Amino acid sequence: MHRARSEHGTRGPVWLFDLDNTLHRASHAIFPRINRAMTAYIVEKLGVAHDEANLMRASYTERYGAVLLGLIRHHAIDPHEFLAQVHELPPLADVLRAERGIARLVAGLPGRKILLTNAPAHYAMPILEALGIRRHFERCVSIEDMADRRAWRAKPDATMLRRLLVREGLAPARTWLVEDTRSHLKHLRHFGIKTVWITGHLPIRNSLGKVMPRSGRPHYVDIKVQSLRELRASLATGEGAKRVARAARQSNPN
């Protein structure tokens, strides 16, 4: 787990940020590259046809939150080998896309920031560096950090989040999960945390051609925004500001 000094101490909200399609547009070029690498890995290791491997990759992502967990459970693959092979990054200047002024937007959010990603550290940290936002994150929790003695874990695993909240001393009422993946928001909101659904980086269709939902605001989403800029604006005025203030009062009743 990578740590940096907190910029805001222990007061105020705590933001648990997803990485891909939340802080940058992974669907532009990085996700297609990773998806191809994952499918090729499955073809090579399991000896299945390309189409079957592609369906397996998508199915495990939907069922377990990460392809890795399905491959471990059903095929006993080497997790470290898998993560190393399928998360090789090209030159980031060629593929990285993010909001203009993202460093200023992240820095301007009140409270602590923790990265919570199902990606490995050797992938996540260079992206944070390239975006110029690594120093704004007090913790960077990768999929390796989510594992325990019993099993590898990934969002939306309940045991993983429960241990993270305890380890970091986070009050659920003032903890906000910022995600593009609705299923993660839905499952983890049961802990009493608040949820932000960010939709601006979502592709129109997923890798199998299915339309990605982005309309409406499900009951388990507290704030829906298209961008970090919109999130900042909603926290300055309006309903977003009221929700953050209400969460702070709930966690500090005195």
What label would you give each PLM region?
Residues 1-10, 107, 121, 125-254:
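Asp-based, Mg2+/Mn2+-dependent phosphohydrolase catalytic module
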Residues 43, 72, 92, 114, ...:
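Short, flexible active-site loop motifs that bind/organize anionic cofactors or intermediates
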Residues 112-114, 194:
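Proline-centered loop/turn at the N-terminus of a beta-strand
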Residues 7-17, 22-101, 107-108, 122:
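N-terminal helical cap/lid subdomain that shapes the substrate entry/recognition surface
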Residues 117-119:
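Conserved phosphate-coupling serine/threonine residues in phosphotransfer and NTP-handling enzymes
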